[in-house]
């Protein structure tokens, strides 16, 4: 019976599709051609009715690797049909910068999917929301809040340093004992975000903290899976375990975040700003008072504040902790890099204090190593897809309205035309001949995206990665436990490129065994 029901649904959908078949076939023929009259479209993968190019995308390769490999046959800019959606893949920095910077507003849209609608209350966040007056007002409000509760201020540095100290205490207690650092790094980064957003931090075993970890894992695990329901939304009528888990996890997240926001609203006096939620409430209040007509027109609601905090947790914790895990993995593979970072810390910071954010301008090799981690293992190898809000072009090719544009950051960061031996981990590529920091040795280096859709948390992420790594390496040498293999550097594609689990031995450096710093 279930099979018959499925067939009936499929036939119904196919017949509905046939109504538009002539128009769609003509459109796909034009898109699949290199040129048609005066219009030139990117070369396209073969496509079939209903399923599009799915049969040609089903190889057992992660999407970023598959898209990179397809360049050999289709060029650095090509297209395919994902069901009924026209998708363009960008694999070079010239086209990527045109999309992100030169034509950022034109390609500023976001695709609506079943999964992201559940995750964002129908697009009320910043990362996945479509480009619109509401989105612009929302982003401006968040930027105002971040400035108010300052990126780069003493407050944020103190928060990160406190968690770095706590992390170092944990490593000290596990000296010479194999430790999976992943949970500790996640805990440290999560506490930074909790302190930033709610003026709260959690200890191990705290029930509320464990709830956060549980729903975060549920969201990450389900969103990471290839979901046919995002290609064929009508599949929602069938039981879907992953969607059920996602809905449950999002409900748990929203319940906790709403509780925190309500507590802040009750205590908020309009003047004192203790954390980011207070800053968001004040920024929203200020903008409504100063631009009452604008705020009413854009329809900014409390849901937008809740989703902003959800964005910060969802993106801020997963991405930053993953960068740190990759950094540790590569330092284990390249102990000479770890040693050079430690030597730089010894000379330029010394043993009488801990690293500060202001040291970034003198710790050139440390910063270069972090940049190389971001290059060789971009946390988000495929940036969140963009959508063309009107017909436009990329290079010499015409791009139709509503086309989805995917920037393959992996290809940009491993382009042999831009990087010498791109698969080799080499911090020196971010240094000049005098050992000074080169911030962007190639226009292909775009770890946080660019333009109007650039990651809002870029500054915070860079601060966290720098302070956590420099604090750890100042005091400890990281080694692979005896008999264990080196960490796997392939990773697993998902919401981010996940590091496969591995263990570390953190040895307190000899010079630090008799040193105590008064903070």
From Swiss-Prot:
Reactions that this protein is recorded to catalyse: a C21-steroid + reduced [NADPH--hemoprotein reductase] + O2 = a 17alpha-hydroxy-C21-steroid + oxidized [NADPH--hemoprotein reductase] + H2O + H(+); 17alpha-hydroxyprogesterone + reduced [NADPH--hemoprotein reductase] + O2 = androst-4-ene-3,17-dione + acetate + oxidized [NADPH--hemoprotein reductase] + H2O + 2 H(+); 17alpha-hydroxypregnenolone + reduced [NADPH--hemoprotein reductase] + O2 = 3beta-hydroxyandrost-5-en-17-one + acetate + oxidized [NADPH--hemoprotein reductase] + H2O + 2 H(+)
InterPro entries per UniProt: Cyt_P450 (IPR001128), Cyt_P450_CS (IPR017972), Cyt_P450_E_grp-I (IPR002401), Cyt_P450_sf (IPR036396)
Cofactor: heme
Source domain of life: Eukaryota
Sorted UniProt keywords: Heme, Iron, Lipid metabolism, Lyase, Membrane, Metal-binding, Monooxygenase, Oxidoreductase, Steroidogenesis
E.C. designation(s): 1.14.14.19, 1.14.14.32
Protein's gene: CYP17A1
UniProt GO cellular component terms: membrane
Leading EC class: oxidoreductase
GO MF annotations, alphabetized: heme binding; iron ion binding; lyase activity; steroid 17-alpha-monooxygenase activity
Localization per Swiss-Prot or TrEMBL: Membrane
General function of this protein: Conversion of pregnenolone and progesterone to their 17-alpha-hydroxylated products and subsequently to dehydroepiandrosterone (DHEA) and androstenedione. Catalyzes both the 17-alpha-hydroxylation and the 17,20-lyase reaction.
GO BP terms in the entry: hormone biosynthetic process; progesterone metabolic process; steroid biosynthetic process
Binding residues for heme: 455
Gene source species: Rana dybowskii (Dybovsky's frog)
Family listed: Belongs to the cytochrome P450 family.
A Pfam family this chain is assigned to: p450
Name of the protein in its database record: Steroid 17-alpha-hydroxylase/17,20 lyase
Pathway recorded for this protein: Lipid metabolism; steroid biosynthesis
């Amino acid at each position: 019976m279930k099979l018959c029901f499925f067939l009936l649904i499929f036939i119904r959908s196919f017949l509905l599709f046939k109504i538009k078949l002539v128009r769609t076939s003509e459109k796909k023929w034009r898109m699949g051609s290199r040129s048609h009259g005066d219009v030139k479209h990117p070369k396209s993968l073969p496509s079939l009715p209903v399923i599009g190019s799915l049969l040609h995308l089903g190889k057992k390769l992660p999407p970023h690797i598959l898209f990179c490999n397809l360049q050999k046959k289709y060029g650095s800019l090509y297209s395919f049909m994902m069901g009924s959606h026209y998708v363009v893949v960008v694999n070079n920095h010239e086209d990527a910068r045109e999309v992100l910077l030169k034509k950022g507003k034109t390609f500023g849209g976001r695709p609506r999917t079943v999964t992201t609608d559940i995750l964002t209350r129908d697009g009320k966040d910043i990362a996945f929301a479509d480009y619109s007056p509401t989105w612009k007002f929302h982003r401006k409000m968040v930027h105002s809040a971040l400035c108010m509760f300052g990126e780069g201020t003493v407050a944020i540095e103190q928060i990160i340093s406190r968690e770095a100290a706590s992390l170092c205490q944990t490593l000290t207690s596990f000296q010479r004992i194999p430790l999976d650092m992943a949970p500790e790094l996640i805990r440290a980064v999560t506490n930074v975000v909790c302190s930033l957003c709610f003026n709260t931090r959690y200890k191990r075993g705290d029930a509320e903290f464990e709830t956060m970890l549980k729903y975060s894992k549920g969201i990450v695990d389900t969103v990471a899976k290839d979901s046919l329901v995002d290609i064929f939304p009508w599949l929602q009528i069938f039981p879907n375990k992953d969607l059920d888990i996602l809905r449950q996890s999002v409900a748990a997240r929203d319940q906790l975040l709403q509780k925190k926001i309500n507590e802040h609203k009750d205590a908020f006096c309009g003047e004192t700003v203790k954390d980011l939620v207070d800053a968001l409430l004040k920024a929203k209040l200020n903008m409504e008072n100063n631009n009452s007509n604008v705020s009413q027109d854009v329809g900014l609601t409390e849901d937008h504040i809740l989703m902003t905090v959800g964005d910060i947790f969802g993106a801020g914790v997963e991405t930053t902790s993953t960068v740190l895990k990759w950094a540790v993995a590569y330092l284990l593979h390249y102990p000479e890099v770890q040693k050079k970072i430690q030597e730089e810390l010894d000379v330029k910071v010394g043993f009488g204090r801990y690293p500060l954010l202001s040291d970034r301008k003198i710790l050139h090799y440390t910063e270069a190593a972090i940049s190389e981690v971001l290059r060789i293992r971009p946390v988000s190898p495929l940036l969140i897809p963009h959508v063309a809000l009107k017909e436009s072009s990329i290079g010499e090719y015409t791009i139709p309205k509503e086309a989805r544009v995917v920037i393959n950051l992996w290809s940009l960061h491993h382009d042999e035309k831009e990087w010498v031996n791109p698969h080799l981990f080499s911090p020196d590529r971010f240094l000049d001949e005098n050992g000074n920091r080169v911030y962007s040795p190639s226009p292909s280096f775009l770890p946080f995206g660019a333009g109007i859709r650039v990651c809002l948390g870029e500054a915070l992420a860079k601060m966290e990665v720098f302070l956590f790594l420099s604090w750890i390496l100042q005091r400890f040498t990281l080694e692979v436990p005896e008999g264990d293999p080196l960490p796997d550097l392939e990773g697993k594609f998902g919401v981010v490129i996940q590091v496969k689990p591995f263990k570390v031995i953190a040895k307190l450096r000899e010079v630090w065994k008799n040193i105590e710093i008064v903070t």
